[in-house]
Amino acid sequence: MKDYNTDMPETHGNNTSPTFHIGSIPIYGDAILSPMDGFSDWPFRSICRGLGSAMSVTEFVKDKFIIHALEHIERRFKYDEAERPVAFQIYGDDPDELLEAALRVQELKPDIIDINMGCPAKTVAHSGAGVGLMRTPLKVARIFRKLSAALEIPVTGKIRIGWEDYRSYKLIARIVEENGGAAIAVHARTKEQGYGGEANWDVIAEVKAAVKIPVIGNGDVKVAADIERMKAYTGCEAVMIGRAAVGNPWIFARLDRSQVPPEAVRQMVHQHLERHMAFYGVRIGMMLFRKHAMQYLKLQRLPRATRTRILLQENAEDFLAALDEIYTGLEIQSETSLRL
């Protein structure tokens, strides 16, 4: 019987040749979990990596926090060897501080350092970091020149289209490449779009035509078929998947949620919650897991009252008991329908 929670996708998990390289780092596979603040922590990354995500990228961390309080935020850089290649994503607006931060976290032995130039949040962008850097191309050049010269590992960047009044994506991509960047990921939305509206895949294709380093596309990959569709449309080497993976980590195994049996979902919720509680502690782990639980249950298309009953359980034992009761019934229904 197929194990939906551990089987690697046949076309990628058994590859002997890399799909592409980031600097000297071989990447096996073409679908990657996107870094997402509040979501791409070790529990979720490790699950997605096990299902076929080609590498792991951490949640972003501000350079000043790394310099002045690394011991308090080091958990964000937690990874295990099975996740490699691992990229640490950092952000800031000062080239010297980003360099100092990168040198410090390099000691934790990631494979890659990634610079966030795409976060649209006001607190980040309007301080000149995240997508705010896309308004300052000379600063981007200094950042990549300094880091690529000083670090022993590849440096990459993640960008957006830019701002509605300053769409600098091709300029920034060329600057990243010319100043030592080893790859670039492109979220095909503007700062103002945030995470809404339609992603413009033409932008990814334009960046791919403008640079020789690997390009990773991001935006509106919602179902498994979109992975190949984006690659064919844009020519990008790989695809990043963010929100569509929350509640459906099986997308990295080229499965849509409708293809995953209820019992596999039930087992995954157990596994994911256990990792959350082991990582954060029982109380905080349960609290932080609710946002994942909501998506697992929402995508099961359960009645709202049923979802609410499960989500309102205050402790892990009661939550899992309510979950098991519902999913056992779903599995029986699924088996019955298959026999009919």
Task: Write out the residue ranges for each language-model feature.
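Short glycine-enriched, charge-decorated loop/helix-capping segments at active-site entrances
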Residues: G128-M134, D256-Q259
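Alpha/beta enzyme core
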Residues: L99-A129, L138-I213, Y233
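Hydrophobic faces of well-ordered beta-strands that scaffold small-molecule active sites
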Residues: A31-S34, S56-T58, V86-I90, I113, ...
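N-terminal small/glycine-rich loop or linker at the start of catalytic domains
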Residues: F20-I32, K64-P85, C119, V124-S127, ...
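Active-site beta-loop-alpha junctions enriched in small/polar residues
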Residues: M36-G38, V61-D63, Y91-D93, G118-P120, ...
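Alpha/beta catalytic cores of nucleotide-metabolism and tRNA/nucleoside-modifying enzymes
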Residues: M1-G23, I27, A31, D37, ...
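Glycine-rich, positively charged N-terminal anion/phosphate-binding segment
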Residues: Y4-H21, M36-D111
